[in-house]
Design a protein with these regions (language model features):
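Pseudouridine synthases involved in rRNA/tRNA modification
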Residues: 163-188
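Conserved helix-adjacent loop modules within structured domains
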Residues: 139, 143-153, 170-174, 178-179
Length: 188
């Protein structure tokens, strides 16, 4: 297997892998510009290869990852108006308190059963380790960064929704901890 890093605005620095036969590897040759050759195939420019190298046998970009990272962007009432944000940020009509959101988010950090914050799948575990969660405002836009060993289905979206309630003053840190402890999803 081989892997490369792809980069675009949304999926910046993602790792992908490509399984090639020995014949395909031979055709690539020892060209020092393998990245350039691959980028010619990716003509739209939305994704490009920055680095390419052989990976250990059995490597899988999805299942061999040490952790996963999401950055969720929210443009609220106090954010600058920008047409560039339309594709990359959730718009929220009221001003959010990102400091309260950050404080409340810390209740979710650590190894927990996140059944309350995801849509469980058959035979799938909802136990995850949320290694980092932060809420900051950068250039007027709220960024929620989550790093975990893995994320359950809809987990990030559900956590972000709960944090928006905190930022709106409709929920507290204690509410987030209480919901987490329930280990049962109460709404869709």
């Amino acid at each position: 297997p081989l892997y490369s890093s792809a980069a675009s605005d949304v999926y910046k620095r993602q790792v992908v892998h490509i399984d090639l036969t020995k014949a395909q590897v031979k055709r690539l040759g020892r060209n020092t510009d393998v990245e350039g050759r691959l980028n010619k195939l990716l003509t739209k420019g939305d994704v490009w290869v920055k680095h390419f190298e052989p990976a250990p046998a059995g490597f899988d970009a999805r299942f061999s990852a040490i952790n996963r990272r999401y950055i969720y962007k929210i443009a609220d009432k106090s954010s600058p108006k920008s047409p560039q944000l339309v594709r990359y940020a959730l718009y929220h009509l009221r001003t959010l308190d990102e400091k309260k959101m950050h404080d409340a988010a810390q209740a979710l950090k650590g190894l927990h059963d996140f059944a309350s914050y995801c849509k469980p799948r058959a035979f799938g575990s909802t136990i995850r380790e949320l290694q980092k969660i932060s809420v900051t405002r950068k250039n007027g836009v709220i960024e929620i960064e989550l790093v975990a060993d893995a994320f359950a289905h809809n987990m990030v979206r559900s956590i972000v929704g709960a944090l928006i309630k905190v930022g709106d003053g409709k929920a507290s840190k204690e509410d987030l901890a209480r919901v987490l402890a329930m280990r049962k999803r109460t709404s869709t």
